[in-house]
Amino acid sequence: MQYRTLGKTGIKISEIGFGCGNNAVLMVRASYEEQVSAVRHALDLGINYFDTAFAYGMGKSEENLGKILSDLGASPVVSTKIRLEIAADLKAATIEAVDAGLKRLKKKSVDLIQLHNRVTVERSPGTRFSPTPTDILGRGGILDGFKEMREQGKARFFGFSGLGDPKALHELIDSGEFHLFQAYYNLLNPSAGHPVPAGFGALDYGRLIDRAAGKGMGVAIIRVLAAGALTSSPDAGGGSSPEPLSPGSDYALDLERAEKVKFLVDGGIKSLTQAAIRFALMKPEVSTVLVGFSNVAHIDEAAACSGAGGLAEDAMARLRKLWDTDFGKLRS
């Protein structure tokens, strides 16, 4: 396992991170014995970064991870995320949410806390609260809650999920206040790290990864497998929500796009999964690639990508042609 520095934090984390989310279900629905076996195996392979959240099983993922790490006597780098409801006092709501997460994790402190809500230019009119940059950066806002947690010794660093309006996400990055963000980045939508043309079908994140690295932030890649579209068993994928995590990346469309990148599997790359992970690791600005696992074999497949090198230049040239034409939908 190879390691990279998490931005300006100085923390060394594994190139492959253990995603404890809903899609792979392991840390939410599997038996305790299966979960312990998987976590122990990941630790033995050198994986030292675990990412969880309240939203994963309504706290079950945090509870399961906390118990397992306690039982194993292990102390890897742990990041958890909070999802807030609209509140008159966002600072207080943030503090309350972080404290609740620590209780579920059975920890007095955590390495990283992150905001899980989408961030938008204007507050969402729907039932799910999407804060604005002002809600986060303003006086008495979410950032102040994170800072209070740091002052109390309950969190070392903080970040956010890079979902929502790209303009709002760029504003958070430009503030220089955060240590990490989670980037939506994969072979089917590379816009957080590569230029895409006007009219590209998926949301253009405007090279957020490069912008964040310029501010000294660490970058954790999410949805590297496009909710399962970039795996050997895409029929089992699709995520836990009928709505796509990122606009323009609904599962049916991603399955069509994935068909056009299957040329990446050759003698040197054994699976589309490995091609996707190795692609994400090509950017030096990336700190870790978060992968969700359903079993121990999946952990081995992902871990083998660390140190294996990136995609060949001719493969990258073919990918760029696909991106430049939105997978054949635009004229080159």
Descriptions of predicted regions:
Residues 1-9, 66-70, 94-105, 168-174, ...:
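Short amphipathic alpha-helices and their capping/turn segments at secondary-structure boundaries
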Residues 1-77, 95, 186:
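N-terminal binding-site loop/beta-alpha segment at the start of enzyme catalytic domains
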Residues 6, 18, 42, 50, ...:
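Conserved, mostly hydrophobic/aromatic
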Residues 11-16, 46-49, 73-76, 107-111, ...:
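Short, well-ordered coil/turn segments that N-cap beta-strands
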Residues 29-42, 90-104, 164-172, 276:
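Short, acidic/polar
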Residues 58, 118-331:
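Beta/alpha (TIM)-barrel catalytic core signal, keyed to glycine-rich beta->alpha loops juxtaposed to Asp/Glu
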Residues 75-86, 114-115, 187:
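A short, structured active-site edge motif that brings together acidic residues
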Residues 93-114, 147-152:
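CE4/NodB-like, metal-dependent polysaccharide N-deacetylase domain
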